[in-house]
Amino acid sequence: MNLHHGAATASEARGPMPGRLGAAPPRLGNVNFHEVTIRLGARAQPRLILDRISLDIPSGQFVCVLGPSGCGKSTLLNALAGFVTPSGGRIAVDGDTITTPGADRGVVFQDPTLFPWKTVLANVSLGPLLAGVASDEAERIGRKLLGRVGLSSRCESFPKHLSGGMQQRVGIARALANNPRVLLMDEPFGALDAQTRSMMQHVLLDVWAEVGVTVLFVTHDIDEAVTLGDRILIMSASPGRIIDDIVVPIARPRADDVMFLAEFNHIKRRCFDHIRRESISAFAQQHEV
C-alpha cells in the first residue's frame, strides 16, 4: 500500500527550496520506501518490526512520524539512515538504494552526542574535514551553520558549557555540515523542557526553510508533529505499518498561536484517536496470556 496521497500538495505550496551552502549543488532528497519489511532479533525467531512499508517523500518536505511506543518509528528512521538493513523491499534516496550510512543523510538523536573535548566549532566542522574539505572551508561552513542556529558567539565554547537546547542546536548544525539531502531526527527535543522545546521547534523551522533539506522527524508529541510537519505518518502497534498519512494544510510560516486554530485541533484529534487506539492494541498485545 503506497500512502502518499496529497504528498506533493504541501511541498508545492512552499515551492522549491534548494540548499544554500555556497558552492554546494542544488539539493534533492526524494525518499522512497517500497514494500520494506524489517525483522530483528534471534535468527531462529526474528521479530517482525516493520511490515511492508511503502512511502514516497518529495524533496524538501517535512514529514513527522507518530505511533505508540515500540511500533518501529525509530527503526524506520534507522533504516533510512543505513543503520538497519531491511529483510525485504527497498529504500532509496533520489533513486540510489540505501545499504549503508552516508553523508547524504544527516542524523540528529535525542542525545546530541557531541565530542566533549572539542569546541562547538570543531564539532560542527569535523564532518566536512573527514569528507576531505580544506580546514579553512570546513571552518567557514561550521561558522555559517552555527550562525543559522543562533550560536555564532559560542564557537569556541565546549559542550559542557552549553545548555541542553544549545547542545541540540549544535547537533542540528553538525548534521547539516555535510550538506545532506535528508535530515533524520529521532525525538531530538524529547528531553527538553516545554519552553526550550518550543524555541527549538522555531529554530529548526527557520533553518529548514532556509536550507530546504528533506526532514523525517520521529516524535511522541502530537502537538509537535502538527506544528512542524507538512505531513504526519501514523504507525500502527507492532508490527509497524503506516495506517494514515495526514497532510497538514496550515500555511507557513506558522505563528506562535497556531495551536489555537480549528484546523490544528482537527488534525490533532485525528492523530490522538489513532494513537489511543493503537496504544490500547499494543498494551493488549503485551499482556496476552
Which residues does each predicted region cover?
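Non-catalytic connector elements of ABC transporters
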Residues: 1-15, 19, 258-289
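ABC family nucleotide-binding domain
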Residues: 15, 19-223, 228
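Active-site/binding-pocket entry motifs
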Residues: 39, 251-253, 277, 281
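Short hydrophobic beta-strand elements within the C-terminal catalytic ATPase subdomain
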Residues: 93, 234-235
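A generic structural signal for secondary-structure junctions
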Residues: 129, 247-251, 276
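Conserved catalytic segment of ABC-fold P-loop ATPases
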Residues: 228-234
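Conserved beta-strand-loop-alpha-helix hinge in the C-terminal portion
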Residues: 235-270
